Amino acid sequence: MTITRKSHPLMKTINHAFIDLPTPINISGWWNFGSLIGLCLIIQIATGLFLAMHYTADTLTAFSSVTHICRDVNYGWLIRNMHANGASLFFVCLYLHIGRGIYYGSYLYKETWNVGILLLFMVMATAFMGYVLPWGQMSFWGATVITNLLSAIPYIGPDLVEWIWGGFSVDKATLTRFFAFHFILPFIIAALAMVHLLFLHETGSNNPLGISSNCDKIPFHPYYTFKDLLGVVILLGLYMTFVLFFPDLLGDPDNYSPANPLNTPPHIKPEWYFLFAYAILRSIPNKLGGVIALVMSILVLALFPILHTSNQRSLTFRPISQCLFWILVTDLLILTWIGGQPVEPPFVIIGQVASILYFLIILVLFPLAGLIENKMLKW
């Protein structure tokens, strides 16, 4: 008997997931981002592995080892720039993927959605720890400020911070453990992504109309493999443009100075993809309140399936909800801008208004709009 993709145990699994998978006929380019996130993860793991071969996780030599990679290692500058900008690309794809899920009601696949939220938290943790590794000024102070937020947790907070630091400040122990976690987490993310796919293939993909597509499906290959391939070519084009022409555009100039615990940078801020959450954190003058708001800014995604009140799944035929969705997108862009600004008027009040609006749209206005649209359509 010949071994075919339909009979071989391993090939059979791959076949069901990527070749003969029944896929809705009408899914648009917004469905490309899942595969693009997978590509980003592969690029990050590959470039990260080569960086880890030359990097030393020691406070005295970490900064020098990154310089050594860029100057002395064959194509080290390219690998380092690919890894640094790959993180930005990863988050662009993630946010667009989540936005697609919200717009088209994909969050109603609860298991897939919840695993996705867990994946987002893990990717954010990995990116944060990776930012600490070059041991520049912003690496050190970013690590100090963000880990210090845990001290706001009642009773166990201060002990928890010292436990994470491995001492009384961010030092060698912190850097070593951050490197260890930064190395292992992407592999856990890859495994969890498989679980994400497993749950998705239990239900099948959603589509722009938000209705069942069981009556009209096509095989994933060759139709969507080639469609995804177009996305890959566009993505790699944008990616390599950034890597080769503007490698430092998204970075912070402060991170080109070695970490100095005696000199605080004037504006401590995380990478651009965390600025919206950082703005929400800073909008609340209370430390514990800020930390809760920071966590809730991501965790609020888990409430989408519970707060879905409309009789339609997608926003395709829901004009009020569409307006709210694009206001939410604009609000997130404003929060991202505010997160990069100093804490002074008028930025403080703009950030506070934008933070309130963010939670108001998700928790109140979206469910309300769903009910109004049901009435308008007499459903």
From Swiss-Prot:
It holds the Pfam family Cytochrome_B. CDD domains: cytochrome_b_C (cd00290), Cytochrome_b_N (cd00284). Coiled coil: none annotated. It comes from the Eukaryota. One of its GO terms (cellular component) is respiratory chain complex III. Heme b b562 binds at H83, H182. GO terms for molecular function: metal ion binding; ubiquinol-cytochrome-c reductase activity. Its cofactor is heme b. It is a multi-pass membrane protein. The keyword Cytoplasm does not apply. A ubiquinone binds at H201. Heme b b566 binds at H97, H196. The chain crosses the membrane at residues 33-53, 77-98, 113-133, 178-198, 226-246, 288-308, 320-340, 347-367. Keywords: Electron transport, Heme, Iron, Membrane, Metal-binding, Mitochondrion, Mitochondrion inner membrane, Respiratory chain, Transmembrane, Transmembrane helix, Transport, Ubiquinone. SUPFAM superfamilies: a domain/subunit of cytochrome bc1 complex (Ubiquinol-cytochrome c reductase) (SSF81648), Transmembrane di-heme cytochromes (SSF81342). The keyword Metal-binding applies. InterPro entries: Cyt_b/b6_C (IPR005798), Cyt_b/b6_C_sf (IPR036150), Cyt_b/b6_N (IPR005797), Cytb/b6-like_sf (IPR027387), Cytochrome_b (IPR030689), Cytochrome_b_C_euk/bac (IPR048260), Cytochrome_b_N_euk/bac (IPR048259), Di-haem_cyt_TM (IPR016174). It is found in: Mitochondrion inner membrane. Binds 2 heme b groups non-covalently. One of its GO terms (biological process) is mitochondrial electron transport, ubiquinol to cytochrome c. Heme 1 (or BL or b562) is low-potential and absorbs at about 562 nm, and heme 2 (or BH or b566) is high-potential and absorbs at about 566 nm. The cytochrome bc1 complex contains 11 subunits: 3 respiratory subunits (MT-CYB, CYC1 and UQCRFS1), 2 core proteins (UQCRC1 and UQCRC2) and 6 low-molecular weight proteins (UQCRH/QCR6, UQCRB/QCR7, UQCRQ/QCR8, UQCR10/QCR9, UQCR11/QCR10 and a cleavage product of UQCRFS1). This cytochrome bc1 complex then forms a dimer. Belongs to the cytochrome b family. Component of the ubiquinol-cytochrome c reductase complex (complex III or cytochrome b-c1 complex) that is part of the mitochondrial respiratory chain. The b-c1 complex mediates electron transfer from ubiquinol to cytochrome c. Contributes to the generation of a proton gradient across the mitochondrial membrane that is then used for ATP synthesis. This is Cytochrome b. It comes from Liomys adspersus (Panamanian spiny pocket mouse).
